[in-house]
């Protein structure tokens, strides 16, 4: 397993030229590695065995397992009644709906002296049935949502996501990787051409002077439109990151059939150590044992229903993976949203842009920084910020000093020492 995941670690290594900021890197690179690791972990049969294992009296067990894996399994729906809903249902009314199965239970069920209204077309809770029938209660002990079905009383909940988990994770990894791939194409190795060979702390004098003259010439040349498009494309990729995080939260909600709305209520039970409710909510989406119905036809064409019990070992891991991914996507959406707000503030405020450049400089006054940035557009500023994190700090300070002197000589004013 480690040998399969090890190549992904190279994707997290820092490059000599950084074309993404920290939020972009976490969003596109770290998330992709997490998703690919989860998909590899789920596909490792040596740890979890086959994705489904069924128990049956039939000899052709492999056929049954393949059928249940292909057609899907189900559990009996567990209704989560509140106190008010439970007060509306009496034992006698529940038992009367299935007299054949509850013939022995109706004589022992407690009688209610008060008149209770019932809703039409009422479908009873699986747990409520078990409270008034001992045999059915024993069957419920197999697993949550696994027991005999009662016509008109129980409802099936199909686990349609189980076969698609690995495919979903691979698709999500591609979606999260797309903005970084798009920006890498749009960036066109511009920063590498500007900042190569000058990112180290120690530079030869010849390289230092050559690169300094090249950067001064570049930022004194009018590339206003090109730099604005450069910045606009990067901001578009940041917006894409935010939208992808939000959409993936919604996708998980739909994919898991509204689990997260229930899961938030389950979190409230942790301070009270209500693990029974926690287990019920978790088992309604990630059951470890489920039912599977296989049709077997006789010689005359009569269909016989084979009720099989299936173990879903991958749900042990699916439960942890999706809980983590939901929290991770929420964190990514929050970070991307805050990053966009900061980007908007930088675009609207020249003062903030000057302060950001000044934070990269030491021993340079605010007035000199302001003069060096006087003729630079917002696109020029954006590219200069990218250059500042990829070059030697001393080289960047000398670049700003050169620009300040050029602006001063062009205006005909005198320049005081920046220190």
Swiss-Prot record:
GO terms for biological process: intercellular transport; monoatomic ion transmembrane transport; phototransduction. Residues 1-21, 184-238, 342-419 are cytoplasmic. Expressed in the cortex of the pupal CNS and at low levels in the wing imaginal disk. Residues 43-162, 260-320 are extracellular. Its main location: membrane. It is a multi-pass membrane protein. It is found in: Cell membrane; Cell junction, Gap junction. Keywords: Cell junction, Cell membrane, Gap junction, Ion channel, Ion transport, Membrane, Transmembrane, Transmembrane helix, Transport. GO terms for molecular function: gap junction channel activity. The chain crosses the membrane at residues 22-42, 163-183, 239-259, 321-341. One of its GO terms (cellular component) is plasma membrane. Belongs to the pannexin family. Structural component of the gap junctions. This is Innexin inx5. It comes from Drosophila melanogaster. The lineage of its organism: Eukaryota, Metazoa, Ecdysozoa, Arthropoda, Hexapoda. The gene is Inx5.
